[in-house]
């Protein structure tokens, strides 16, 4: 019997499984890109589910045999990165005619890397953002995500560093792609 992989909108009931996946992915898939200290800091202070995306129905999970193997989404809101623990204040809507949609919080379970799950999420998000009238997409990439985003047609427009508690600097890359 073959396993079926399905992509569906995330629900509030998925949040515990997604948070656990994000923790595993943030630590294990950062090896070779970030120091252990950087991976732990970014996973603790930045990575996580942004429940606004779940409420907006723009965050998705990929499941196989009932197990969540990947999550990620897009947003019509201004926040560029970070889970609920990183947010402060309202998250205004973007203007699709003049501002890029945001690609947000892509994570793959360390048990399922390089199986096309990230690309599947990206293609789905691009279709949805295009249907919503957006002309471009933008994201803040962690170093482990840069190869996927380059392969999906994104270009780096700015490298920057995020300083986290403990004065831990984590390099990121702002990336953009035209979609229509």
Describe the function of each predicted region.
Residues 122, 129-142:
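Conserved GNAT acetyl-CoA-binding A-motif
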Residues 18, 50:
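Hydrophobic pocket/interface hotspot
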Residues 10, 104, 140-141:
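Small/polar loops that bind or transfer phosphate-bearing groups
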Residues 116:
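Glycine-rich phosphate-binding loop
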Residues 119, 131, 143-159, 165-168:
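Conserved active-site alpha-helix within GNAT-family acetyltransferase domains
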